[in-house]
Amino acid sequence: MGEKSSQLKTLLKKNLLLKSKSKCGICCEIVFPIIIVLLVFAILVLVQLFKPNYDLIKTTQFSNRINENNIIIYGGKAGSLNVEQKGVIDMMKFQLSNELNKSISEVDVYFKEINDKSEMENYFQINSTQVFGGIWFESNQLSSVANTTNTNTTTNSFKYSIRLDSNSVLDSNKVKDNGIDSSDYLTKNWAYIQIAMDQAIFGYFGLDYKLVINGQRYPDPYVELWQKWINGRESVFKSAGSVFVSAALLIFTFRLVTELVVEKETKIREGMSIMGLNQYCYFISWIITSLVTALPIDLIIIVILKGSQVIHSTSWIIVIVTLILYLLTLQLLAFIFSMFFDKSKFAGLLTFLTILLINICGIFIGEYEIINIHIKLLLCCIFSPIGIACSFYIMSIRDIPDTISTINLNQVISEKQIIGTFVFNIIFYTFLIWYLDKIVKTEYGTKEPWYFLFTKRYWTVGAGKINKKNKNKEYNYNDIESTIQNNNNDNIEMVPIEVRNKTTISIRNLRKEFKTGDGLRIAVNDLNLDMFDGQIHGLLGPNGSGKSTTISMLTGLLSPTSGTAFILGNDITYQMNEIRKCTGVCLQTDIIWNQLTVLEHLEIYASLKGITNKKQIKSESLKMANEIDLGEKLHTPAGSLSGGQKRKLCLGIAFIGRSTIIFLDEVSSGMDPSSRRKVWDFLLSHKKGKTIILTTHYLDEADYLSDRISIISHGKLITDGSSLFLKNKYGVGYLLTCSKSLNTIDQFNVDQVTQFIRDQIPDVTVLSNAGSEISFRLPTASLPVFSKFFKDFDENLSNFHIDSYGISVTTLEEVFLKIGTDIDTDALSIADGNGNDDELKRSIGVSSTGIKSKQQLKALLIKRVKTSSKDFKAFLLSLLLPLLVIIGSIIVFKEVDNEVIFYNNSTEPLTFSLLQQYGKNDIVPIQLAGTTSEFDFNKFLSNSPYFNQFQYLNNSINFNQYLINNYKQSSGSINFTIPLSSSLINNTTKVISYNSLFNFNYIHSWPVHVNLINDALLRNHNGIGIECTSLPFDHILTSFQKASQGMNIQSIVYFIVIMMAGFSLMAGSFAGSISQERTNRIKRLLYISGCKKYIYWVSNLLWDYFFAFILLLITCIILAIVDDKFNDQFGLFFLSLVLFSLSIIPLSYLFSFKFSSFGKSTGAITAIHFSIGVIMTIAMIILRIEVIIKNSSSLENIADIIDIVFNILSPLYAFSRVIFIISGFPGSLRLGALKIDDYWSLHYASTPIIILSVHVVVWTIFILLIDYSPEFKGYLRNPKTILPPPPPIDEDSDVSAERIRLESMSPIPSTDQGSGGGGDMLQYKGLHKLFIGKGKNPNKNAVYNSTLGIPQGQTFGLLGLNGAGKTTTVSMLAGDILPTSGQITINGHDLVTDRAQALRGVSVCPQFDALITLLTAREQLSLYCAIKGVPDDKISLVVEAFIKMMDLGKIANSNTGGYSGGNKRKVSLSIAMLGNPSVVLIDEASSGCDPIIRYRQCQVISELGKNKVIILTSHSMSEIQALCSRMTIMRDGQFKCLGSTQHIKSKFGAGYSVEVKFKKSCLEVGIPQSLQCVLECFPNATILDQHDLMASLELPNPPENPIKVSEIFNILSTELSSILDDYSVSQTSLEQVFLKLTGATHEDRLNLNNQQQQQQTIPNSD
């Protein structure tokens, strides 16, 4: 438990460090949720801002509103008015004349009698602007009204109807409406007509009083804070609250999913697992880490929601528990979603959107009462986002008193039930995480079948239970010895007893089988092998030999099919957890976090591996950092380290802590020889007490480091033993390399020399005779005669015209190749056949007949066809997903096709009766003014039929407070402002004044209660009441309403916005593939290979246009079928879509230059297009509607100008503009127009069409200009006119001689440098490249004033440390970057001024594998054949020839994305050699390749380079020696030497290397004493290494006292024969020369060079 606790703390520290380093991420986690919550409150506050007017609404006199242009029309159903009706109208005229102080005749013009209902309606339709209102009398007699006081009696009432435009009154079909009150009756003409009519009726029936009636909304009853949110809670929070809260919390889920998938993607989690990571600790650590920021934010959200009382009734504890549990379920969902992603680019986004979509579905599930509550609970148990939606719904409705009564609580889940589902969610999700982690397949690791829980094996053997059969099995270290003896296997070297007793790893009959489409494949075939403590064990083999599979089984990533292995006594089949506690690993992938520093990495892994003391962690980390040569980089983020430094950090991670079993997979990959040497020293110094398993493709590394070496092929152990054992067993002898004398090279006789050697060594073989060097192979069996032979050879050197010679022993690489080709006879036959098959040679040698645009275009289109067909996801994203979105927009457009009415068009009559409107239970509170109010109440209102519903309030009662406290009981109330007694009895005021207060949502309250009181007052006077009815006219449409009639404006807007989203997604996905090709350098390789830049863009445009055309054609056809407007304007819509596609795609390409991945590019470009387009579109919609509403031509002119600007800024906006025009959106019409007569006019579609055409041209030209900018810069700036800095003062003599030769333009002499004669096919003079530093970074001379000429047929090698200038040189020669100064000439053409001709015959194999992962090797080679201009009829032959030569036949039809690194390099090299180029630039061709592949590559390069110039850069010394007739070593951009390999070794070499193996008898006297005997024979020797019976020494060979090879062999074979079992001698290697010449740069050299540069740049004062 203590160990798990320690791991948990370590992982928490790591996670928190990562979180703290991501300042942007922390800001997002804090700011994003706050913004979301603030957005919720902004909406809620916005809803509250639109609160109604609570002030008193006063009505003015009728006379102030009516005039000759604003008349009253009146009439009756009977054709004429009866006496009472005519009397009332006359009374109205009379009262109006008194108010206006005019005569009756003058006032009469304000009235017009129309006694036909239809005629009145027609008149209103024609003259609506001149009609104040209408009055209609339906009956010629007084109507009867039932008396609610006494139901057996009826009373007479005077009936009339007021007629206004239906949009000036409220909907007669509704009694209540949320958010609407009676104020419209007061603000429009209704109140004036009703008051005037009632006043006229009063006057006619003898009650001559002026009516002053005002209106006021009920005082706001929501006085408490929680009540103030009711409107927002009802309209927003009830439904969308959970969405906002989920979105705020999902930022943490987004980040967590991304982090989890990134660690899976980068194999960091895999590496930690191998080194003992507990998976439960891993998951818990990430949950805690996420909660560190998520929980405080969650609590802040809770405090805001409860503190603001948006959530009021639900208790604090319920809200806290609900949201905390929900947050925890979201974190668990993050783990579940992360299981299904291998790449991080879409993981977080898709998780975010999916959970949010589930939450939105939960809104409908929670609110729909038709869904059974048990089904709701079940869904909540499965999906917690549904639960939170239901929770917010019930919390909200509890705080909406008017709503709760209408909800069936039996169909609503309670908060406590939801908490219960959350608890279940947590348990269920935890189980699901555990279950999915066991069954979901990943790239590495063993997984169970989905049904594993139902198997007997799992419950008896799995789940951590020990297999008793295996537990009782004792492994025997002597098994392998017995196997060897029984099989007489002399390929395995016996292990001494004292070493055998230190066995730490014992592999027994280990076997792994894989089921493939081709049947069963055996990756490891009954392997038996032992490894020992204190040793480095090299595990070698060609690609696919089973090395990685074996290591995967030893580390627990794979389970064996049969057999087992024991590591420190623990069985890998059931004790892997124990094994991993002592395991360290350095995978091929760098398992590091870019944000963390070197020191933080080491401290984390030290703690993870069991070191608990903080001081010890610190000291161990510092010590390790210094030992791996990163002491000066302690606080440098790992992402800023070079590739080699990252490998060193991974090495330190593997060794730090308690690791005793170390697996190193390609630990020195990507390092230069100097860095590799330092790593070797580190490994040798740390191997004590450890077992190190080393895999590498550098055989010299395995040779130098490994105590024992195992070579595996096809899953079987081929041989196992020390390096010397393998060399003696499989060695092919010594290599003798002789340098011919320069002055007498033409007198050299190869037959004479060969015969001399053959006389003493009969089996000698001539390997090569090229230029100034000749090489011989001397068999190992002739070792006893070497002493005499070399003595005789030394005496005859001058006779043979040989200046010097070198001797080297069989290398481990040669052993490896011999073993590999012995096993793989097919490979051997292919390799040997490459040079002899004439037909193969002819096919490979097919030359380019010239680059053809048509051929390139066809090839690039075929490439797009194949990649698109193989990548269904990209196809789905680029075509189907946008199509679905667009179809969705059309569905919205047509499914919501019913016209949305933004005005009231109800013309049903409505009688304003309290009984009819609000029933018998509605109470009418009434408060009268004056001291006699109660008397007045009983006297003057008791005759009302609704008197029983009146509620008298005396003056001591606070009227407003009463209404607030009892607002649910009444629809309206009355407050008299003048005592009725003074008005009706004393006749002192002649005014009846009261305020009619209307309750909110009761839309007809004001006219109902005015009619109620006026009816009561009149009845009290003479028993006659008043009945008022609303009889609306048909609505007269405004210009905007006419324009929008018959259409759903909302659906048009939604349709266009969603369609814009679809086409934005289309454009973004197309740009994603361009961004990906640029990031993966595919485009660069195409350009280097001769692809014309405009052809590249044309091919992409044509392909994307093709898909876009399909999309737009489907869109046009569907819209034409479902909508007549689009059918009528099909041509316009189709043209706009075509132009839009032609413009948006190149614009998206332009945006793609700023993004580095498909996911980022697609998402960002989609967002850019959509956001810009939508913002502009919505802004213009609002502006155009304002134009029509205000009928402003000046505003229309401004809109036109803005419209043009928007069209120019965004093609998407221009396209949307055309859609608006075609759809007939009212905002698209010109002022005064009811329809569009000419869609093609400039005021309509022509303007966006023309601008879209301009977009097409501009953006297409723009992307070409950007890509052709290097050419333009080259034409404007010629590097030949810029002087390079002067040559270094200490320049090597051979380098100076080459500079002088080229400057004099003399032909190349035949020299010892192997340059041969004839003219140079490639030469550069004064080549210099200075990179200008940015900020504080200094300028850097990448290449410093280099001069070189290379003739046809020569392979030239470039060596140097990382950053020496090799790749920069190759890039300048390839025309990829421009030199700062100097001249490059290729085949007589200047690279700058005659670029096309110079690069015509140049081909490049770049350092990177810029392969199209979705194409096979065959498809890839066919593509580049066409790019390079190979004739179409020859392409198939050429491709097949290269596939055969490179041994790619078995995988030629598989996508290159699945190839190993070596096979990818073979394809890249083949691409470079296609078309028989005259100059081939090969940059690190063998990087990541095993020796067999390197051997095959060397054969290909050697065979094909006979008539070419080849420049080769490499970190492999053996590769340079095998291929290059001339070479140089670069340091700080300068040539440090120049010549053949033997010339350079002779000139700069330090002597000879001697490797000896002592006899076992030496153990008795001690190895140190035996070593002392060797040193006495070689006094100047230095011991380089000693382990077991092996020792390596270096013998200096000073020029003043040279040592002869014959003397060395003589001493070894005579004086030391008694103590030596075996020995080997070789000249100082090229690698040692390399290390010598690439030592640290001296400060004085840098200062001197800087001074020379300054002197060169200072102008002459003369």
UniProtKB/Swiss-Prot annotation:
<keyword id="KW-0812">Transmembrane</keyword>
<dbReference type="GO" id="GO:0005524">
    <property type="term" value="F:ATP binding"/>
</dbReference>
<dbReference type="InterPro" id="IPR027417">
    <property type="entry name" value="P-loop_NTPase"/>
</dbReference>
<dbReference type="InterPro" id="IPR017871">
    <property type="entry name" value="ABC_transporter-like_CS"/>
</dbReference>
<dbReference type="Pfam" id="PF23321">
    <property type="entry name" value="R1_ABCA1"/>
</dbReference>
<feature type="transmembrane region" description="Helical">
    <location>
        <begin position="1130"/>
        <end position="1150"/>
    </location>
</feature>
<feature type="transmembrane region" description="Helical">
    <location>
        <begin position="1201"/>
        <end position="1221"/>
    </location>
</feature>
<feature type="transmembrane region" description="Helical">
    <location>
        <begin position="242"/>
        <end position="262"/>
    </location>
</feature>
<dbReference type="GO" id="GO:0030587">
    <property type="term" value="P:sorocarp development"/>
</dbReference>
<dbReference type="GO" id="GO:0006869">
    <property type="term" value="P:lipid transport"/>
</dbReference>
<feature type="transmembrane region" description="Helical">
    <location>
        <begin position="1052"/>
        <end position="1072"/>
    </location>
</feature>
<keyword id="KW-0067">ATP-binding</keyword>
<feature type="transmembrane region" description="Helical">
    <location>
        <begin position="1163"/>
        <end position="1183"/>
    </location>
</feature>
<dbReference type="InterPro" id="IPR003593">
    <property type="entry name" value="AAA+_ATPase"/>
</dbReference>
<dbReference type="GO" id="GO:0016887">
    <property type="term" value="F:ATP hydrolysis activity"/>
</dbReference>
<keyword id="KW-0547">Nucleotide-binding</keyword>
<dbReference type="InterPro" id="IPR003439">
    <property type="entry name" value="ABC_transporter-like_ATP-bd"/>
</dbReference>
<comment type="similarity">
    <text>Belongs to the ABC transporter superfamily. ABCA family.</text>
</comment>
<dbReference type="Pfam" id="PF12698">
    <property type="entry name" value="ABC2_membrane_3"/>
</dbReference>
<feature type="transmembrane region" description="Helical">
    <location>
        <begin position="284"/>
        <end position="304"/>
    </location>
</feature>
<feature type="transmembrane region" description="Helical">
    <location>
        <begin position="30"/>
        <end position="50"/>
    </location>
</feature>
<feature type="transmembrane region" description="Helical">
    <location>
        <begin position="872"/>
        <end position="892"/>
    </location>
</feature>
<dbReference type="Pfam" id="PF00005">
    <property type="entry name" value="ABC_tran"/>
</dbReference>
<dbReference type="GO" id="GO:0016020">
    <property type="term" value="C:membrane"/>
</dbReference>
<dbReference type="GO" id="GO:0043231">
    <property type="term" value="C:intracellular membrane-bounded organelle"/>
</dbReference>
<keyword id="KW-0813">Transport</keyword>
<dbReference type="GO" id="GO:0005319">
    <property type="term" value="F:lipid transporter activity"/>
</dbReference>
<keyword id="KW-0677">Repeat</keyword>
<dbReference type="InterPro" id="IPR056264">
    <property type="entry name" value="R2_ABCA1-4-like"/>
</dbReference>
<dbReference type="InterPro" id="IPR013525">
    <property type="entry name" value="ABC2_TM"/>
</dbReference>
<feature type="transmembrane region" description="Helical">
    <location>
        <begin position="346"/>
        <end position="366"/>
    </location>
</feature>
<feature type="transmembrane region" description="Helical">
    <location>
        <begin position="377"/>
        <end position="397"/>
    </location>
</feature>
<feature type="transmembrane region" description="Helical">
    <location>
        <begin position="1102"/>
        <end position="1122"/>
    </location>
</feature>
<keyword id="KW-0472">Membrane</keyword>
<protein>
    <recommendedName>
        <fullName>ABC transporter A family member 5</fullName>
    </recommendedName>
</protein>
<keyword id="KW-1133">Transmembrane helix</keyword>
<feature type="transmembrane region" description="Helical">
    <location>
        <begin position="317"/>
        <end position="337"/>
    </location>
</feature>
<feature type="domain" description="ABC transporter 2">
    <location>
        <begin position="1322"/>
        <end position="1557"/>
    </location>
</feature>
<feature type="transmembrane region" description="Helical">
    <location>
        <begin position="1246"/>
        <end position="1266"/>
    </location>
</feature>
<feature type="binding site">
    <location>
        <begin position="541"/>
        <end position="548"/>
    </location>
    <ligand>
        <name>ATP 1</name>
    </ligand>
</feature>
<feature type="binding site">
    <location>
        <begin position="1360"/>
        <end position="1367"/>
    </location>
    <ligand>
        <name>ATP 2</name>
    </ligand>
</feature>
<dbReference type="InterPro" id="IPR026082">
    <property type="entry name" value="ABCA"/>
</dbReference>
